[in-house]
Swiss-Prot record:
Associates with collided ribosomes, but not with correctly translating polysomes. It comes from Salmonella arizonae (strain ATCC BAA-731 / CDC346-86 / RSK2980). Acts as a ribosome collision sensor. Detects stalled/collided disomes (pairs of ribosomes where the leading ribosome is stalled and a second ribosome has collided with it) and endonucleolytically cleaves mRNA at the 5' boundary of the stalled ribosome. Stalled/collided disomes form a new interface (primarily via the 30S subunits) that binds SmrB. Cleaved mRNA becomes available for tmRNA ligation, leading to ribosomal subunit dissociation and rescue of stalled ribosomes. Keywords: Endonuclease, Hydrolase, Nuclease, RNA-binding, rRNA-binding. This is Ribosome rescue factor SmrB. Pfam families: Smr. It is an enzyme of class 3 (hydrolase).
Length: 183
């Protein structure tokens, strides 16, 4: 490491002569607050971990048996088939929407995991997943992935106002969830 060049006696004397009559500026207009550690890093890591955990449910090798005729639909064994009918009629309106347009399969899996995690955290029981038409890759894979997740109670092709056959309405199991009573 190099030493800084020191000023000669002449330069130091000249500097002192030029500074005669000056006074130090008192800086009192800006308050310097001590910098704090960013707290947002810990929740971000936790969210990433939750998304990764949720995406482990989605396998490309496992092919659940779904109805291939008519609209895409699925209901878990312990859930009433009447829930599918209510979804088809539009009795449920989604509170959260997920658009998968333009995503890769890996990104779509991660986003689905994040959606399910967010719904459970916010106690949202109905969400809409818009997979689009495209090359039909996500349109075919999305129902297969959703049927594998243990917190997905049911899904059905969305009504026209929510995307029709390019979207799915998904019922997600949240703690202490009760279906709303119809009038």
């Amino acid at each position: 490491m190099k030493k800084k060049a020191s000023l000669s006696e002449e330069d130091q004397t000249l500097f002192r002569q030029l500074m005669v009559g000056t006074r130090q500026i008192k800086q009192d207009t800006i308050v310097h607050r001590p910098q704090r550690k960013k707290i947002t890093e810990v929740p971000t890591r936790r969210l990433i971990q939750e998304q990764a955990d949720a995406s482990h449910y989605f396998s490309d090798e496992f092919q659940p048996l779904l109805n291939t005729e008519g609209p895409v639909k699925y209901v878990r064994e312990d859930v009433s088939h009447f829930e599918l009918k209510k979804m088809r009629r539009g009795d449920y309106s989604p509170e959260l929407f997920l658009d998968l347009h333009g995503l890769t399969q890996l990104q779509a899996k991660q986003e689905l995991g994040a959606l399910i995690t967010a719904c459970r955290r916010e106690h949202i029981f109905c969400a809409c997943v818009m997979h689009g038409h495209g090359k039909h890759i996500l349109k075919q894979q999305t129902p297969l992935w959703l049927a594998q997740h243990p917190h997905v109670m049911a899904f059905h092709q969305a009504p026209k106002e929510y995307g029709g056959d390019a979207a799915l309405l998904v019922l997600i199991e949240v703690e202490e969830w009760q279906p709303p009573e119809l009038p």
